[in-house]
């Protein structure tokens, strides 16, 4: 659905890793070729006709480009592929078409790439290599196993419009694909604080950002609502699938929660996560999403599909004030020790999107926003300071992600 809604060509994601040494392009080329061989389902081109998008196998090498600038996937410079690797000095960039997989799927790819770059012959449990064949569980989409619903017979409640920060503050879109503000929080400062307040990194950041927005708009009238992205693979019993398997938990920061101390707020958010991310609820939500996607696929032509998908996505945008996405802590410390920084960039919608990565003892917060003004980000820094948390700022820059040519 998102694919058709963003058919203007920017539904991509860039993972920006700063490594511990200057990159050897020859070693990286070898690592990239082995990684591409391990992930044939990512080595495709995206095509479209008058009716639909579709994938086509691409046997050309995955592009390796010496640049830190934005590139175009699906174009000649990237051999028509939906992903590519760029580098500049000690900076590594993985550009990836988000319609093919989510952050969990992309992390597996990145782990394999870094494994072949740094280790190759040494066994690191859990990393997919050429010695671990692609399984049926890896390629199967669990949503295909869910029943299709007749959505015309279901009366879905319309969620109320949430507080929109741009509208409330009268801010203008900065242009391009938005801005990224980079913030690093040491784990040895953040994790004990998070645990002592009954939180997790993603939940704690969701709460702190809500409190930050309250600092700026203490008298707001529209509800302050956030979405927290969760990995649905465990609930769908499809831990190994590469397909997009995300769902969202909805947090309402209402008057009752506003009056609570931080620990109680985190407890409430944990409870909401437990209830909304249980197996039955997730399967029900993914069934609706899968049915909606199939309904769009069954529409007669491309333009109709794009219009319906865009309308559906815009409805979800109006129901949230911001989104927090946290894939989870990096699983492979042998590789993680080589990663100095880990930033995640994606085009920004009508509200802030906070992408969180945790690796090598640090939490990297990519605060993505569609406007120039820093008031909400600065309010988050005030929350960190008042709670005695350490942090390091890495500046602000335009979001630099690939377009995709179809």
Spell out what each predicted region is:
Residues 77-119, 129-139, 357-376:
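Histidine-centered acyl-transfer/condensation active-site motif
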Residues 1-52, 60-84, 215-406:
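Acyl-thioester-dependent acyl-group transfer interface
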Residues 2-6, 72-73, 78-80, 85-86, ...:
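Short leucine-rich amphipathic alpha-helices used at interfaces
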Residues 100-108, 112-192, 384-406:
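Non-catalytic, low-complexity flexible loops and terminal extensions
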Residues 20-39, 95-111, 180-219, 324, ...:
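Acyl activation and transfer enzymes in specialized metabolism, enriched
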Residues 87-89, 199, 318:
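Short, well-ordered loop/turn elements at secondary-structure boundaries
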């Amino acid at each position: 659905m998102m694919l058709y809604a963003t058919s203007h060509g920017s539904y991509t994601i860039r993972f920006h890793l700063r490594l511990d040494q200057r990159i050897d392009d020859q070693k990286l080329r070898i690592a990239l070729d082995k990684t591409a061989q391990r992930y044939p389902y990512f080595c495709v081109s995206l095509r479209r006709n008058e009716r639909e998008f579709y994938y086509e196998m691409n046997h050309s090498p995955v592009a390796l480009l010496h640049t830190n600038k934005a590139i175009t996937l699906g174009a000649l410079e990237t051999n028509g592929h939906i992903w590519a690797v760029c580098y500049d000095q000690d900076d590594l960039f993985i550009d990836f078409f988000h319609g093919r997989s989510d952050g969990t799927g992309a992390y597996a790819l990145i782990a394999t790439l870094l494994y072949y770059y740094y280790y190759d012959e040494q066994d690191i449990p859990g990393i997919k290599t050429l010695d671990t064949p692609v399984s049926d569980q890896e390629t199967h989409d669990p949503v295909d196993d869910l029943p299709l619903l007749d959505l015309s017979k279901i009366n879905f409640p319309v969620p109320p419009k949430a507080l929109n920060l741009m509208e409330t503050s009268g801010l203008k879109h900065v242009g391009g694909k938005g801005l990224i503000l980079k913030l690093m929080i040491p784990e040895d400062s953040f994790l004990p604080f998070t645990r002592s307040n009954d939180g997790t990194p993603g939940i704690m950041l969701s709460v702190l950002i809500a409190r930050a927005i309250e600092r700026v708009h203490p008298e707001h009238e529209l509800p302050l609502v956030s979405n927290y992205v969760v990995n649905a693979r465990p609930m769908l019993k499809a831990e190994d699938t590469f397909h997009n398997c995300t769902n969202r938990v909805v947090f309402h920061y209402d008057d009752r929660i506003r009056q609570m101390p931080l620990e109680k707020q985190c407890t409430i958010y944990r409870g909401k996560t437990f209830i909304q991310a249980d197996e039955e609820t997730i399967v029900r939500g993914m069934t609706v999403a899968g049915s909606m996607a199939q309904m769009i696929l069954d529409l007669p032509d491309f333009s109709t599909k794009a219009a319906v998908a865009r309308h559906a996505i815009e409805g979800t945008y109006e129901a949230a004030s911001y989104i927090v996405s946290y894939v989870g802590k990096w699983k492979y410390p042998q590789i993680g020790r080589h990663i100095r920084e880990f930033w995640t960039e994606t085009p920004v919608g009508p509200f802030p999107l906070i992408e969180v990565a945790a690796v090598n003892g640090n939490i990297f917060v990519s605060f993505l926003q569609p406007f120039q003004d820093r008031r909400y980000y600065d309010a988050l820094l005030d929350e960190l300071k008042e709670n005695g948390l350490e942090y390091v700022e890495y500046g602000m820059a335009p979001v630099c992600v690939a377009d995709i040519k179809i």
